């Protein structure tokens, strides 16, 4: 959810693109599988949810099973390869693997896995200038300045991973 919110806020506040953010909460709200949809478009957005997605970011196995069928042919699938198998049963999508859980633990804080994956996504897709995304993260974490260096390192690591898989 954090990853989607950062992406939507950065795009909405700093570009001329149209953006929707649609979170889905349920029993999963505290630590389980939750999801959100972010739509970024140069055109007006008629509905916040579509039937087919261009890009899909998957952080766990249950999310892969639930949402992989909605990824369009030729779409980009970003997986947390620390815990999600790359045996996805589809050869018609571009697979971008990032061991974000492992990297976050190596950095000393599992919570930065979302920021690493955000960096992977932005680095791979170039959907938005990374500097704009980082400004949004800085703003969101302004009340917790001690978290900024670790999150900066996490975001930059993700950018490097994403760019390296283009």
Regions found by a protein language model. Name each.
Residues 1-166:
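Active-site cofactor/cluster-binding pocket
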């Amino acid at each position: 959810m954090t990853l989607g919110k950062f992406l939507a806020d950065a795009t909405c506040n700093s570009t001329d693109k149209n953006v929707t953010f649609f979170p889905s909460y349920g029993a999963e709200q505290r630590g389980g599988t939750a999801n959100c949809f972010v739509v970024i478009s140069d055109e007006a957005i008629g509905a916040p949810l579509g039937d087919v997605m261009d890009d899909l970011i998957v952080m766990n196995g249950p999310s892969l099973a639930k949402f992989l069928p909605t990824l369009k042919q030729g779409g980009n699938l970003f997986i947390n390869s620390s815990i999600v198998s790359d045996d996805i049963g589809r050869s018609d999508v571009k697979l971008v693997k990032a061991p974000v859980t492992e990297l976050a633990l190596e950095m000393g804080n599992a919570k930065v896995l979302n920021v690493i994956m955000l960096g992977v996504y932005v680095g791979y897709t170039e959907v938005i200038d990374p500097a704009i995304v980082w400004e949004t993260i800085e703003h969101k974490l302004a009340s917790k300045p001690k978290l900024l260096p670790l999150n900066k390192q996490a975001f930059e690591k993700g950018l490097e991973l994403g760019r390296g898989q283009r």
